Curated annotation (Swiss-Prot):
Catalytic activity: H2O2 + AH2 = A + 2 H2O; 2 H2O2 = O2 + 2 H2O
Pfam family, one: peroxidase
UniProt source species: Escherichia coli (strain UTI89 / UPEC)
InterPro entries in UniProt: Catalase_peroxidase, Haem_peroxidase, Haem_peroxidase_sf, Peroxidases_AS, Peroxidases_heam-ligand_BS
Gene Ontology terms, MF aspect: catalase activity; heme binding; metal ion binding
Superkingdom of source: Bacteria
Protein name: Catalase-peroxidase
Keyword check for Electron transport: no
Sites of the Tryptophyl-tyrosyl-methioninium (Tyr-Met) (with W-105) crosslink: 226-252
Taxon lineage: Bacteria, Pseudomonadati, Pseudomonadota, Gammaproteobacteria, Enterobacterales
GO biological process: cellular response to hydrogen peroxide; hydrogen peroxide catabolic process
Chain residues that bind heme b: 267
Cofactor annotation: heme b
């Protein structure tokens, strides 16, 4: 570290002092703007996963590449890999099946149904923080074992698909019949920045299960996938873990039966590793020295691998046949009496005190041990509801196999969206309710049909605001994380969306559009709702003096109520939608942060978000018809007035109350209130990044550009769930 004496001495010798010290001179080094302003709005979340980070280029077509894959040759290679034990990470009982199942499970298990983020769909286990989570110790070895296969098949199989397929093959090679496999997960090339993993600053900080219901978190401790296997906060109490298990699995959309099946099925094969104290384990992959080449957790205990391996610190083998599928998990769970003990690493676990030594040692065939289980395994015996399910599975192994097959498929495909996104020869034919199924198309409107429908909509008496609002309400439920929601299916007309507060005004247009749909018989209601938005935007642009054609692609269908899981669709109800100036709760985040959250779910860039908000305001599309943010005297005209007036220094803004959610814009000279605004409006003048974009649209030469940008962003949102157009 340089001192003043160092600088004096180097100056005296003629050497540049700034090349002598220990200061970080690399790009991005030093104190950052986020260090100075930690609450800075995360506009950068809208710039993730651009083509600039993609080495494959924007023309790469994964579905096309996958079609060239020797799928069954790949599965054959994966099966062979399972028993090709490597000396740098020897396989337990000569099989990597348990390791690969855990890799797939922990990749998929980050999914949270409350916001649709997380999951295995983008291969995020390769990147921080997941590649270095405490619950993912040793999965770096699993991924490295797969590298020769990934190298062989190249871009015909993504890492994201390979992780899940490896888990499937591991189960199948162990004698289990899986439900199927759908490929289609495309890799990204940098960590997701939008996933909220929690506020804790230390790994394995405990969370109360009740807190999980108020936030989109999927684990009871920072750095875990689900729950602490030693019980809540290392309590060692099986019964007390029930609430935590239900909360975490419930946040993934799993019911009690699926939860029991997943825990038992996941613990039928393989083992945990706790040969010695975890203090022997070195830094995780992100913190490991460069020569470790992306591997982490190097152990100094014995050989550090094989019989000396330390992963969780628990040393548990559940079944007598840890490389072959069986019902031994339930048989052992109920047959024996379990006594709390500790692993060689000191972790709390249970041992079957009255059982003979029937469990094979993973590396020494001459040794046997007693069955062992995790604290949370015993929850399946001692919680009354879990016990009922577990005993049924004990007495009906086929029911267990079926339940696990379906739950595993759901676990590993939950974030992929509708079945139409699946590719490959093993996609199950059955439609499942959690896939948000849609019927087959029955309409095929011609160009003339569309023209006729547009005339009917234009003559319906619905205003521009009503037309735009109903289309936005239908399409804006889309979530980029799990590909749920969107306009296809016209679920705006079904429960629960029809009764959401945010849609109260928008759905008033539905009876008119439903009448047009029935009278024409030429298109689905879903298409007509989107077409209503087309008519509204074109009318608004025309009123602004511009002749604009808004692209429209028919082909949407109408879902039935029985194809709609009301409980799961309730999760799509927005806490806030800044595009409509809607906010339901004030106890979560700031309004402007929630606007960014919504825009990110809609896969929008900062300019796209800016154009849409500015356009929605002048079109009068606020959810409640309020004038907040409507900085124009010509509502329904697609002008750039929102930006012009927002940036006009004639007005000063003051909060209307202590909540600082609503503001009045007063004329600086007269004091007259000219406009009212929300935080979702004023952020475009306050935040430096968004203001830079707003200044473009407020310029005297920007009106036509603004309209074209608005239309492009609008069409993007309307088509977010049109996977058939890809």
């Amino acid at each position: 570290m340089s001192t003043s004496d160092d600088i004096h001495n180097t100056t005296a010798t003629g050497k540049c002092p700034f090349h002598q010290g220990g200061h970080d001179q690399s790009a991005g080094g030093g104190t950052t703007t986020r260090d100075w302003w930690p609450n800075q709005l995360r506009v950068d979340l809208l710039n993730q996963h651009s083509n600039r980070s993609n080495p494959l280029g924007e023309d790469f077509d994964y579905r096309k590449e996958f079609s060239k894959l020797d799928y069954y040759g790949l599965k054959k290679d994966l099966k062979a890999l399972l028993t090709e034990s490597q000396p740098w990470w020897p396989a337990d009982w000569g099989s990597y099946a348990g390791l690969f199942i855990r890799m797939a499970w922990h990749g998929a298990g980050t999914y949270r149904s409350i916001d649709g983020r997380g999951g295995a769909g983008r291969g995020q286990q390769r990147f921080a923080p997941l590649n270095s989570w405490p619950d993912n110790v040793s999965l770096d070895k699993a991924r490295r074992l797969l590298w020769p296969i990934k190298q062989k098949y190249g871009q015909k199989i993504s890492w994201a698909d390979l992780f899940i397929l490896a888990g499937n093959v591991a189960l199948e090679s162990s004698g289990f019949r899986t439900f199927g496999f759908g490929a289609g997960r495309e890799d990204v090339w940098e960590p997701d920045l939008d996933v909220n993993w929690g506020d804790e600053k230390a790994w394995l900080t405990h969370r109360h299960p009740e807190a999980l219901a108020k936030a989109p978190l999927g684990a009871t401790e920072m750095g875990l996938i689900y729950v602490n296997p030693e019980g809540p906060d290392h309590s060692g109490e099986p019964l007390s873990a029930a609430a935590a298990i239900r909360a975490t699995f419930g946040n993934m959309g799993m019911n009690d039966e699926e939860t029991v099946a997943l825990i038992a099925g996941g613990h039928t094969l393989g083992k945990t590793h706790g040969a010695g104290p975890t203090s022997n384990v070195g830094p995780d992959p992100e913190a490991a020295p460069i020569e470790e080449q992306g591997l982490g957790w190097a152990s100094t205990y014995g050989s550090g691998v094989g019989a000396d391996a330390i992963t969780s610190g628990l040393e548990v083998v559940w079944t007598q046949t840890p490389t072959q599928w069986s019902n031994y998990f339930f048989e052992n769970l109920f047959k024996y009496e379990w006594v709390q003990t500790r692993s060689p690493a000191g972790a709390i676990q249970f041992e079957a005190v009255d059982a003979p030594e029937i469990i094979p040692d993973p590396f020494d065939p001459s040794k046997k041990r007693k069955p062992t289980m995790l604290v949370t395994d015993l929850t399946l015996r001692f919680d009354p509801e879990f016990e009922k399910i577990s005993r049924r599975f004990l007495n009906d192994p086929q029911a267990f196999n079926e339940a696990f097959a379906r739950a595993w498929f759901k676990l590993t495909h939950r974030d992929m969206g509708p079945k139409s996104r699946y590719i490959g020869p093993e996609v199950p034919k059955e439609d499942l309710i959690w896939q948000d199924p849609l019927p087959q198309p029955i309409y095929n409107p011609t160009e003339q049909d569309i023209i006729d429908l547009k005339f009917a909509i234009a003559d319906s008496g619905l205003s521009v605001s009503e037309l735009v609002s109903v289309a936005w309400a239908s399409a804006s439920t889309f979530r980029g994380g799990d590909k749920r929601g969107g306009a296809n299916g016209a679920r705006l007309a079904l429960m629960p969306q029809r009764d959401w507060d945010v849609n109260a005004a928008a759905v008033r247009a539905l009876p008119v559009l439903e009448k047009i749909q029935k009278e024409s018989g030429k298109a689905s209601l879903a298409d007509i709702i989107v077409l209503a938005g087309v008519v509204g935007v074109e009318k608004a642009a025309s009123a602004a003096g511009l002749s604009i054609h808004v692209p429209f692609a028919p082909g949407r269908v109408d879902a039935r109520q029985d194809q709609t899981d009301i409980e799961m669709f309730e999760l799509l109800e927005p806490i806030a939608d800044g595009f409509r100036n809607y906010r339901a709760r004030l106890d979560v985040s700031t309004t402007e942060s929630l606007l960014i959250d919504k825009a990110q779910q809609l896969t929008l860039t900062a300019p796209e978000m800016t154009a849409l908000v500015g356009g929605m305001r002048v079109l009068g599309a606020n959810f409640d018809g309020s004038k907040n943010g409507v900085f124009t005297d010509r509502v329904g005209v697609l002008s750039n007035d929102f930006f012009v007036n927002l940036l006009d220094m004639r007005y000063e803004w003051k909060a209307t109350d202590e909540s600082k959610e609503l503001f009045e814009g007063r004329d600086r000279e007269t004091g007259e209130v000219k406009y009212t605004a929300s935080r979702a409006d004023l952020v475009f003048g306050s935040n430096s990044v968004l203001r830079a974009v707003a200044e473009v649209y407020a310029s005297s030469d920007a009106h036509e550009k603004f309209v074209k940008d608005f239309v492009a962003a609008w069409v993007k949102v309307m088509n977010l769930d049109r996977f058939d157009l890809l």
